[in-house]
Each structure stands twice: as C-alpha cells, then as structure tokens.
C-alpha cells in the first residue's frame, strides 16, 4: 500500500537511537513510545515489539538493530516524524551499534535510576559522542523504591561528563514521563541535513533475510532519493541491484513511493544472502553516483573461533543446512568444514565474541533441534615464522612445527569493569590471575571502575561467569580489542593411552599450562570408564609430559579356579594375564564417551 507522495521536510524529522546497558529498560521504553504515538493498536502491542527473536526476549537483549517510524503531534501543534533506531547493547555487536548511531543525529541515554551507570552504558555513550550526537539523559524506573535520582544524576556528570541537571525522569513500565521524553526528542535533538537534488547517498544500517522477499535492507538516506525501479550500486562490494520496493516500518512494514533525505526505511532488491549487503556500506545511484562514500565502513572480522560437531554423526547434513541458514541472516558469522579424529565431521565457526557464540549455539539447538558439541573457544593468533612469513592460526591443532616459529602473538583487550567496592579485591585478583595489567582504578561513589589490559585468550574461557560469581552478579564488564602482543605461548596436547586427542589441544601461556593440564587430566580420569588395561591420561607440551593421571584396569580373578595346590600354577596364570594386558594395551582402543569431551571442554578453573 502506498501511503504518501511527498517527502517530509527535514526540520520535521528526528532520527534518534536509545543507548543503555542491558536491563535498563531500553526495549520497554521503545514499546511505550510506539504505544503513545499510536504506532500499534493496544491489541497488536506485544511486550518488546522490536525484539523479534525469542532469544532476544528471553535473555532481555537486543541482537539485531531494528527501526520504527513514529508520527508525533508535538506541543507546538506541528507533526513530526520520529525515526527510532533500536540498537543492540552488547559489546559483541559494537559495530552494528556504531552503524545505527551513524544513521542518527541524537541519542537518548537511558540509565536505570536504581542501578546507575554501568560498563556498557559507558561504551555506547562514547560511541554516540564520537558520532557528534546530541545526548538527552533519561532516568528510567523512577517508580522503584530503590531509585535514587540525585545520586544517578551526579554519577552521569562524574563518569560521563554530561550535564544531567535537566535529565528527563520517567518510568517506562507505568508510562510516567513518556510525553516529556517525546517533547525532549523534538525540542532538544537536531533535525537531519541533506540535499534532495544531490546524487543518492545512503547508509546501509542493517540487513536481514526474509523467506519471501529475500534480503531486506535497512537504509538511512543522506542525499538524493530512493524509489522502486532505481538501479543502485553498493560502493564497497561493487554489486548493482534493481530496487523492487521501498517502505518504512511503523513498526509494520508499509510501502511508500520513495524515501527522501533524512529518512530511514527499507528496500528489497532480490539480493540472495545478507553477506552481499555489508553493514556500513554506502548505496548510490548507478547512473549518477555520489563522489565519495560515507566514512566508517569496516569489514566485520570474527574474533572467537570454536568447532561445532553433531553429537550424532548422522546429523551432519542437518548441521550443514542450519549453519547455511544462519549465515543468510548474520554476515558476521563464518564457518568452514573441519574433521576431527575424535569427533568426526563438523564446522569451525567464527564469532564476534562470546555472547554471539552462545546465541548461535542456542539458535542451532532451539530452531534446528540439533545436539551439538562445541570445542574449547580459541582466538586468532598471529604467528611469525623463521622464514619471515606471517600466518593466522584459527585452530590450535594446526600449529606449525615449533622449530619454524619465531614468535606467537595473541590479541589483547582493554576491559572496563564496574563493581561495588566490596568485591573489588576479588575482581582484581581474577584479573591478575588472568595475566592482566592494571591501567587505572577510580571510584564513583561506592562503585569502583577498573580498567585492565587482558589477553583475550584468558577471557574467552569463563572470565565473565567467574566475574559474575565473584561479585554476586553486580559487576558489569565491557571490552574493546586493543592490539596483538607476543607472548610465551605453548601448545598443550592431551594424550589418552599415548594417542593425542585433537579436539582437546589448546594454546596456553607457559605459566598456566601445568595447572590447566592437571585440571584437564583429572576431569578426564573421572569420566573415562575403566577398560581391561591401564589407561594413562597425559598433558604434554611438545615431548614433555607436564601432568598425568591413570585410569586403573578392570581385573579378572584368573586364579579363582585354583583350589590350594602349587603356587607356581597361580604365578603362571597371572603372568599369562599380564602378557595379555600388555598386548591389549598396545592394540586396544580407548572409547572416550561424549560426556567426557563436553565436561573437559566446559572445565571451570578454580
């Protein structure tokens, strides 16, 4: 349905995003704004309209950026178009956040009036400031008994440096203060700029796969206009497409004739998969292209890798189809086939971070009903060889011969941790144990902010879980990748009955190898059932064994049938048994149960 012919004047448009830490009420506030402006009827309102995936609703996080166009009649009698960009709050999706922010001129900073400023609030606000946003602070959840408005205002001023004296107070749950939020958007945020007669210049904010339409592309128009039938070109990938239809979300998809400068909408153009529509790309007219692309485009590079294998080898084809489907909708997820002697065929997958990895795993098991084993997550190492070559290592099992290696460099991150000061000692000890280097420590009221440099390898295992348990769930954590630094890293192999198990090999720092190896061996000993022969379980670095546990043999009483009689007869039978065991150990195969793999890979260090 075509709803309008003329483009909205620029001074009547406001493009804004909502920035907040997880659980500070961002999605609930979006729901209230949609409801108040009449975007959906009361019957169509479902809680968290913009979080489409079940996982998004259950975990209370926003994964994909969403957008909605609201029509608002302001106090001055004018009607404004408000484009709300709902951004993911989690650090793994920082690039999606940066593109959503680049499509807006202002941000609403939502802070929970009972919790105060958290680590991700900080990370996202800094991104908004980098994009020259006008920022309106909003204190949410003021209806809670624990809300302390003055303390949180002081915190916003101390930590972020924003003037919070005229912060809007509201409660998205009860609807108090929502009209004030809408007025603040209209009066305090700037309108977009743009030239309708210039060549088309649009930012590709996001893209997702729709079973009927193919890839749906979300765009923000800066100059020119976009309409059906137009031939457009993606400036980074060079691909050209003919536009099938153009529309806006109100939040229902509504077709329009064209999109003008300052507007946010979507188009479809029979694009086959999301990887062909790179987030952050500039879209222009093929016949009359714009001179230069918009700044800030980055190739999305996976940071964490792990192997995914089906528990039942017969499910491999289903897994192949499932990862292919997820890739359609998530260009930052990469995969390639991998085979392991212990686990059979599977895929080596790349993710943006740990939350991304968890979500993909959960979606595979939930939406595609697959039982999976995930190998230990590893990061990308850069290896300098003696012959001067540099290679990237995604899988520890593929490490070249030690004699060829000059040095191994690992990625380091800058981690910002907010914690109540009661738990500060435990948090600092955790960071020190993980080879962290303290950068700064400051106090904001009764909360401490610690900044550490940490190797990503030490964080991907279970850092986040440990941080939460040390701080009783109160600490919040955020990180950015810094650089690669050379380290004393060694490859640790686990041998069962003198055979290396490829799925359990990992790169560890030499200082941590022994404790990690001992823990792995103890775990495996508990879980490998007894066989008829002795099974040694060893952790080795190169040819040196650093830890060993032994699974004792089952023993059959071969002398039971000798009643009394000669001792040499018993001796002969025992010797014969010993010989048989020796031969058995040489040729016997050790069956390692799947539970042993899963438990060893989930090993929690103490």
From Swiss-Prot:
CDD domains: EF4_II, EF4_III, LepA, lepA_C. It is found in: Cell inner membrane. One of its GO terms (cellular component) is plasma membrane. Its EC number is 3.6.5.n1. One of its GO terms (molecular function) is translation elongation factor activity. InterPro entries: EF-4, EFG_III/V, EFG_V-like, EFTu-like_2, G_TR_CS, LepA_C_sf, LepA_CTD, LepA_IV. It catalyses: GTP + H2O = GDP + phosphate + H(+). It is a peripheral membrane protein. GO terms for biological process: positive regulation of translation. Residues 11-193 form the tr-type G domain. Its main location: membrane. Keywords: Cell inner membrane, Cell membrane, GTP-binding, Hydrolase, Membrane, Nucleotide-binding, Protein biosynthesis. PANTHER family: TRANSLATION FACTOR GUF1 HOMOLOG, CHLOROPLASTIC (PTHR43512:SF4), TRANSLATION FACTOR GUF1-RELATED (PTHR43512). Belongs to the TRAFAC class translation factor GTPase superfamily. Classic translation factor GTPase family. LepA subfamily. Required for accurate and efficient protein synthesis under certain stress conditions. May act as a fidelity factor of the translation reaction, by catalyzing a one-codon backward translocation of tRNAs on improperly translocated ribosomes. Back-translocation proceeds from a post-translocation (POST) complex to a pre-translocation (PRE) complex, thus giving elongation factor G a second chance to translocate the tRNAs correctly. Binds to ribosomes in a GTP-dependent manner. This is Elongation factor 4. It comes from Caulobacter vibrioides (strain ATCC 19089 / CIP 103742 / CB 15).
